[in-house]
């Protein structure tokens, strides 16, 4: 699909950047000659806009070998960022998709500035080509034909091998993010814990990773009472899924991802209202993020050891379901008083984190659609983060800045720990109250990370989008897939 060339050839469409300061770039000047001065007229009349994310289409009318030019406005160079570029190109690829373009090229060097080099631009272009044109996988009987972009050429004077590598990495990041989106969008009667485990096993086998899938009996032997409690009401068996990627000769410096895999959440006996229950098929967004990251890792083979652990079940009501006031014993040996059965994700993660440590994780990053409180605090575009290790958090933060997946650190104070440890009957309680809800949930999980360096990522607000946007349709976003993978890639470079 991807090609790199130094000279522009015949294409259906060519994408060109327009900055405010460069309305007459060398390429535009040369092209203007072919257009007999008409491009300059369009610029002066503002028919070609330099405003951020403005897309202006110009038909060559046979004056060049290119059928149409798509000029992408990027605003002022001083405010040009990777986020601007991602949004602008995402919108551009959506436009090309709508026009059913099959052969497109991008004038890569026109997007290059002192801030962003050609490798950056190539990576982002290939990444958002997949993200921006992603379509929901539906179950409708009337399937519409989709015209795909079959050939995408980067025109640049830079080293072709380096640009090809950047295009490949970007493409893999975008594709794996879309894989996670598809998982999150799947209905709960299709994506059960068993089906999620089967998907994980297929992924592991494809990329020659080791894996384990613990069944209920094995969990009972290991004392995974927290995950098993959540599963009590279900007819679907629980799964504790582990993927093991060995990027080094020795099993050291192991990064452990733990993704919440609640395939449907009714709230249990702490029952959600109807409007709060619809959409809870997406409560396994953390698991999807972890699996998406492992897809990237499997493709790119970084020199880093990684474990991905997914505790998976649904949380439903029945005569056997766990109840408020129950006291359960986690794999760690810590006992938990259940005050809220709708705070089930942290229970599953408690055993997931303990299991990841048992498998050898030296660093822990958990990802979960955990609390509505984080949405109240940070909105729908920023992931909440908590940590017991600032050095690890800084590495996660740097990765998130590189991928434009915003995160913001929330605090853990001793008084927060006291609140989750406040129980007359057990070591911990799973829900101290609504105040500081996101912080309480993260603090609870931290009790199981203990002294292992740990970062918690609450993606309840960022895992799904209520409306279409430049990087995709409404629905699942694949939040944190690219950040997790980038973190591992950077670890591997050290």
UniProtKB/Swiss-Prot annotation:
Pfam families: Peptidase_M17, Peptidase_M17_N. InterPro entries: Leucine_aapep/pepB, Macro_dom-like, Peptidase_M17_C, Peptidase_M17_leu_NH2_pept, Peptidase_M17_N. Its cofactor is Mn(2+). It is found in: Cytoplasm. The active site is at residues 272, 346. One of its GO terms (molecular function) is metalloaminopeptidase activity. Gene3D superfamilies: Leucine Aminopeptidase, subunit E, domain 1 (3.40.220.10), Zn peptidases (3.40.630.10). GO terms for cellular component: cytoplasm. It catalyses: Release of an N-terminal amino acid, Xaa-|-Yaa-, in which Xaa is preferably Leu, but may be other amino acids including Pro although not Arg or Lys, and Yaa may be Pro. Amino acid amides and methyl esters are also readily hydrolyzed, but rates on arylamides are exceedingly low; Release of an N-terminal amino acid, preferentially leucine, but not glutamic or aspartic acids. Its EC number is 3.4.11.1, 3.4.11.10. Binds 2 manganese ions per subunit. It comes from the Bacteria. Keywords: Aminopeptidase, Cytoplasm, Hydrolase, Manganese, Metal-binding, Protease. One of its GO terms (biological process) is proteolysis. Belongs to the peptidase M17 family. Presumably involved in the processing and regular turnover of intracellular proteins. Catalyzes the removal of unsubstituted N-terminal amino acids from various peptides. This is Probable cytosol aminopeptidase.
């Amino acid at each position: 699909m991807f090609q790199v060339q130094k000279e522009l050839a015949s294409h259906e469409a060519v994408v060109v950047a327009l900055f405010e300061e460069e309305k007459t770039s060398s390429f535009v000047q040369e092209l203007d000659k072919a257009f007999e001065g008409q491009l300059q007229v369009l610029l002066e009349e503002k028919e070609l806009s330099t405003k951020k994310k403005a897309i202006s289409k110009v038909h060559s009318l046979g004056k060049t070998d290119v059928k149409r030019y798509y000029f992408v406005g990027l605003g002022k160079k001083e405010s040009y960022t990777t986020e601007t570029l991602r949004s602008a190109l995402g919108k551009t690829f959506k436009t090309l998709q709508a026009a059913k373009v099959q052969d497109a090229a991008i004038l890569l060097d026109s997007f290059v500035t002192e801030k962003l080099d050609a490798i950056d631009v190539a990576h982002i272009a290939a990444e958002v080509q997949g993200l921006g044109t992603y379509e929901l996988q539906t179950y409708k009987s009337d399937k519409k034909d989709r015209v795909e972009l079959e050939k995408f050429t980067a025109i640049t004077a830079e080293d072709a091998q380096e640009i090809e590598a950047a295009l490949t990495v970007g493409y893999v990041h975008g594709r794996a993010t879309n894989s996670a989106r598809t998982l999150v969008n799947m209905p709960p009667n299709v994506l059960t814990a068993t089906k999620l485990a089967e998907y994980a096993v297929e992924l592991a086998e494809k990329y020659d990773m080791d894996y384990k899938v613990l069944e209920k009996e094995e969990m009972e032997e290991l004392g995974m009472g927290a995950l098993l409690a959540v599963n009590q009401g279900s007819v679907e068996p629980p799964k504790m899924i582990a993927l093991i990627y060995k990027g080094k000769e020795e099993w050291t410096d192991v990064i452990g991802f733990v993704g919440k895999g609640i395939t449907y959440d009714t709230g249990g006996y702490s029952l959600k209202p109807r409007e709060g229950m619809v959409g809870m098929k997406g409560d396994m967004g953390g698991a999807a993020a972890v699996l998406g990251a492992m897809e990237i890792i499997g493709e790119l083979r970084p020199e880093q050891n990684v474990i991905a652990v997914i505790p998976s079940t649904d949380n439903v009501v029945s005569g056997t379901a766990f109840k408020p006031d129950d006291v359960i014993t986690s794999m760690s040996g810590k006992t938990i008083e259940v005050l809220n059965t709708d705070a089930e994700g942290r229970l599953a993660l408690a055993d997931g984190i303990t299991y990841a440590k048992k498998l050898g994780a030296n660093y822990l990053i958990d990802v979960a659609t955990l609390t509505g409180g984080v949405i109240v605090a940070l909105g729908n575009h920023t992931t909440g983060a908590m940590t017991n290790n600032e050095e690890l958090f800084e590495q996660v933060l740097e990765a998130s800045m590189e991928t434009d997946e915003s995160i913001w650190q929330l605090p853990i104070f001793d008084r927060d720990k006291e609140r989750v440890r406040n129980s007359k009957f057990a070591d911990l309680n799973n829900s101290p109250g609504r105040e500081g809800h996101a912080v309480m949930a993260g603090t609870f999980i931290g009790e199981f990370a203990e002294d292992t360096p740990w970062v918690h990522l609450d993606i309840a607000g960022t895992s799904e989008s209520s409306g279409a946007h430049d990087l995709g349709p409404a629905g699942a976003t694949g939040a944190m897939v690219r950040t997790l993978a980038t973190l591992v890639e950077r670890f591997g470079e050290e």
